[in-house]
Amino acid sequence: MSITKEFDTITAISTPLGEGAIGIVRLSGTDALAIAQSVFKGKNLEQVASHTINYGHIIDPKTGTIIDEVMVSVMLAPKTFTRENVVEINTHGGIAVTNEILQLLIRQGARMAEPGEFTKRAFLNGRVDLTQAEAVMDIIRAKTDKAMTIAVKQLDGSLSQLINDTRQEILNTLAQVEVNIDYPEYDDVEEMTTALLREKTQEFQSLLENLLRTAKRGKILREGLSTAIIGRPNVGKSSLLNNLLREDKAIVTDIAGTTRDVIEEYVNIKGVPLKLVDTAGIRETDDLVEQIGVERSKKALQEADLVLLVLNASEKLTDQDRALLNLSQDSNRIILLNKTDLEQKIELEQLPDDYIPISVLTNQNINLIEDRINQLFFDNAGLVEQDATYLSNARHISLIEKTVQSLEAVNDGLALGMPVDLLQVDLTRTWEILGEITGDAAPDELITQLFSQFCLGK
């Protein structure tokens, strides 16, 4: 990767827009210090030591008007996130003041940064690779401490190290094969080369397949489980949603059909982010608005990773209950018998044995739902092993799957007795695909597309 430092100077607001204690406007580039100094009244920023914070005021150089009282952080290249000169202006939080300072910096010669451009420069300047750059956004978007743990390990380079070490081993193997082909001084050189390839490709395949086994857990922790709460009207779906959220998001009444649409909320269940979808009760109805909600509920059920089927334990099973039991039987399903605080009338013998009796009203057995989720998706294992490297990014997972396919092609070719020089092609392809993960062999279009998904100022 080429080290690029011939960039213009960019600027953006790095804190969320709105009222707050502070706002931060960031500059990065060769002229960052000069541009910041042109609007700063205080110490000469071009002469202060690196990694210092300096008190002063931002002024409009045209009018001399004071815009705000600020603290300015100065960080000199190359010991910065972008490996360029970086200035961060810490202002009082607020839309007007941060925008005013941003416009001043642009007027003085800075360019408005594109989404993710600061991190893109860190990548292009060799400060981080592509997996570490993606981890930056994963940290920002992490919904639980477990998801953040995985993202921090990726930012620290755990996945990069594993991929780079594997690529180097593949390169060493290719070099040895090439030597054996070019200098066939021994009669058994072909057998030696075949044995080497077989041993190494099986080793690489085993390593990457083990990494793929972490993908299910990692992806769930990163993206969450899409969880549909289903049941006929007025069995307690919205009450369950509110109980899990510990706040009133859904309307709870005794009137069947109150939830007429799909309500979505995130909740942290023992470190697992659940995207809870409270669906309208699935039943036949003449109400047009409710019909739309019912259809969306069926769609949510089809797309869900997890289904919470709520039944009313104080009533006998209805045809609607039986229909939902059949509709959800092939899903990752947890059957919840609600209203167990009332007299029980439901026919337990008609239900699978793995139901959980609960009372949303008294909070009975709600904790068992969390335990069952752990059992269904994590085989009762710990969510995150401290020293393990996890795959959680769909792009990484897809590329690792492709590398495993390439290695399988090498092994299949060896079994068929194909010439070694032809099998080199698949092994070389494996090396190239792994390079796409770290960015060493990623096309420019992919890099541009990835960083365009970042937020402004990052």
Swiss-Prot record:
The keyword Hydrolase applies. Homodimer. Heterotetramer of two MnmE and two MnmG subunits. GO terms for molecular function: GTP binding; GTPase activity; metal ion binding. It is found in: Cytoplasm. Coiled coil: none annotated. Belongs to the TRAFAC class TrmE-Era-EngA-EngB-Septin-like GTPase superfamily. TrmE GTPase family. Residues 224-378 form the TrmE-type G domain. It comes from the Bacteria. Keywords: Cytoplasm, GTP-binding, Hydrolase, Magnesium, Metal-binding, Nucleotide-binding, Potassium, tRNA processing. This is tRNA modification GTPase MnmE. The keyword Ligase does not apply. HAMAP family: GTPase_MnmE. Binds 1 potassium ion per subunit. Mg(2+) binds at S238, T259. It comes from Streptococcus pyogenes serotype M3 (strain ATCC BAA-595 / MGAS315). Its cofactor is K(+). (6S)-5-formyl-5,6,7,8-tetrahydrofolate binds at R26, E88, R127, K458. One of its GO terms (cellular component) is cytosol. Exhibits a very high intrinsic GTPase hydrolysis rate. Involved in the addition of a carboxymethylaminomethyl (cmnm) group at the wobble position (U34) of certain tRNAs, forming tRNA-cmnm(5)s(2)U34. GTP binds at residues 234-239, 253-259, 278-281. CDD domains: trmE (cd04164), TrmE_N (cd14858). GO terms for biological process: tRNA methylation; tRNA wobble uridine modification. Its EC number is 3.6.-.-. It is an enzyme of class 3 (hydrolase). InterPro entries: G_TrmE, GTP-bd, GTP-bd_TrmE_N, GTPase_MnmE, MnmE_dom2, MnmE_helical, P-loop_NTPase, Small_GTP-bd.
